[in-house]
A protein has these predicted regions:
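Active-site-adjacent structural elements that line small-molecule/cofactor binding pockets in enzymes
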Residues: 1-286
Length: 286
């Protein structure tokens, strides 16, 4: 059964930007908003005070901010819930609390992960964080079911349109599906892989929950070892012209996503304003 709540009332738009918390700022959020993207996703494990999210909302007028994700192991529900309520009161319908259990290699305390997710969501219920105001990091079928029944929907990370298709079948209609996809705006495949491969290899190809998900999608162990095969890297990191990359993002929408968030990778790791501008033009949102 779905917990008490209503369908998501937050508008994410069709396209968003996913970026690690260390590379975000209120100024960049304002620029992203001006380019026509609907949502900024705060990557990493932002702390429970949600100060960065609040500062980006303060600096913008219509942009939605989502966490991708607050880690259940490091941030108790009792810590993040008051922050959620503070922001939701100040910026109604502009903040989505994305939460997740992370991965077992990240903490020595990683035990009973599924039960931990359930207990965390139970506590959010007790603290009046609405179902419609939260999303769940989800890859496998059991957690996708939780995302469907206990949150506004799922935020899968490091996936492909094939996963989006199967996730939509699992979630059914009317449930948010917002996958992340990495992109490099470079038409040279070797140069693009040189940027994308390290961001996939470390740490994700060494983490069993991501490897298990890729295996479910049909990728062989050999594709995941030694930095990832070219075919796997190309599937997980879209590259090419802005128009080619936009078409790859649209494959998620065609497969059933409501929203797709692009993680724009650059060789120098600097804020990718120029690439975001080019991508926004190709997506037709600028």
């Amino acid at each position: 059964m779905r917990s008490e709540g209503s369908p998501i009332s937050i508008s994410l738009g069709r396209y968003g930007v996913w970026r690690h918390e260390t590379g975000l700022s209120p100024e960049l959020a304002a620029r992203i908003e001006s380019l026509g993207f609907g949502t900024v996703w705060i990557g990493g494990s932002p702390p429970g005070d949600l100060a960065l999210a609040e500062s980006m909302l303060d600096a913008t007028t219509s942009l939605t901010v989502a966490t991708g994700i607050v880690n259940m192991w490091s941030t108790p529900a009792d810590e993040v819930a008051p922050s959620y309520h503070r922001i939701a009161a100040k910026h109604p319908d502009r903040f989505l609390l994305g939460v997740g259990v992370g991965h077992p290699e990240a903490t020595s305390d990683y035990t009973r992960p599924y039960a931990t997710v359930v207990e965390y969501l139970d506590r959010l219920d007790e603290l009046d964080v609405p179902v419609a105001g939260r999303a769940l990091a989800a890859l496998g079928p059991k957690v996708l079911d939780l995302a469907r029944d206990r949150s506004a929907g799922a935020h899968p990370y490091l996936t492909t349109p094939d996963h989006t298709r199967t996730a939509r079948e699992r979630l059914g209609d009317g449930v948010l599906l917002a996958p992340e996809h990495k992109v490099v705006l470079d038409t040279d495949p070797e140069a693009a892989r040189a940027v994308g491969r390290p961001r996939v290899q470390q740490p994700y190809l060494g983490l069993r929950n991501y490897r298990n998900n890729l295996a479910r999608l049909g990728w062989a162990t050999g594709d995941m070892d030694d930095g990832g095969s070219d075919a796997l890297i190309d599937a997980l990191v879209a590259h090419g012209t802005p128009e080619q990359v936009a078409a790859r993002l649209d494959e998620h929408l065609a497969a059933g996503a409501d929203h797709v968030c692009a993680q724009v990778l650059t060789a120098d790791m600097q804020a990718p304003e120029k690439d975001l501008e080019r991508l926004a033009g190709a997506l037709g949102i600028a």
